[in-house]
């Protein structure tokens, strides 16, 4: 069975929950991105690429619900996992903060252009969305954007950059992802994994 896990904030929790479910995947000791452990194979990928790998043939993955929603990935999601909790929020400079309804014509910087557009469409507000890949909170500081849509955990990064959270767009947590074909061809193996992870969660992971 092949697993793909995200590098970054979800990696440790992903390894731990799989280990407690009886699947021990050793992280790579070098910069290699594929590790084989007996009958398991572990791939490491950028968080945004995990659902793509699962969609296109990797059996099982773990990714944040933010990434899955942003990509509109065609994967099965049998379980929400009890880690990686945060939120996707709209934030802007403290001194120029306004309500969502007052944001017509604003420029919004984000790694999540699809989720940002849907949010503003739901609110009937026309904005320009600028896609960036990192350091989103810098955009308002240098005049590239009026506001940002980004992941917020503690809010410390926002405060450090003079930003305030205006509105939560969605709660985010880690999700277990399963490839649709693998669910049929490896049903017993995957079903057993899902049941074991459910037990681990029930026991208070």
Curated annotation (Swiss-Prot):
Gene3D superfamilies: Periplasmic binding protein-like II. GO terms for molecular function: ATP binding; ATP phosphoribosyltransferase activity. Its EC number is 2.4.2.17. It catalyses: 1-(5-phospho-beta-D-ribosyl)-ATP + diphosphate = 5-phospho-alpha-D-ribose 1-diphosphate + ATP. Pfam families: HisG. Keywords: Amino-acid biosynthesis, ATP-binding, Cytoplasm, Glycosyltransferase, Histidine biosynthesis, Nucleotide-binding, Transferase. One of its GO terms (biological process) is L-histidine biosynthetic process. Pathway: Amino-acid biosynthesis; L-histidine biosynthesis; L-histidine from 5-phospho-alpha-D-ribose 1-diphosphate: step 1/9. It is found in: Cytoplasm. GO terms for cellular component: cytoplasm. Its main location: cytoplasm. Catalyzes the condensation of ATP and 5-phosphoribose 1-diphosphate to form N'-(5'-phosphoribosyl)-ATP (PR-ATP). Has a crucial role in the pathway because the rate of histidine biosynthesis seems to be controlled primarily by regulation of HisG enzymatic activity. NCBIfam families: hisG. Belongs to the ATP phosphoribosyltransferase family. Short subfamily. This is ATP phosphoribosyltransferase. It comes from Thermococcus onnurineus (strain NA1).
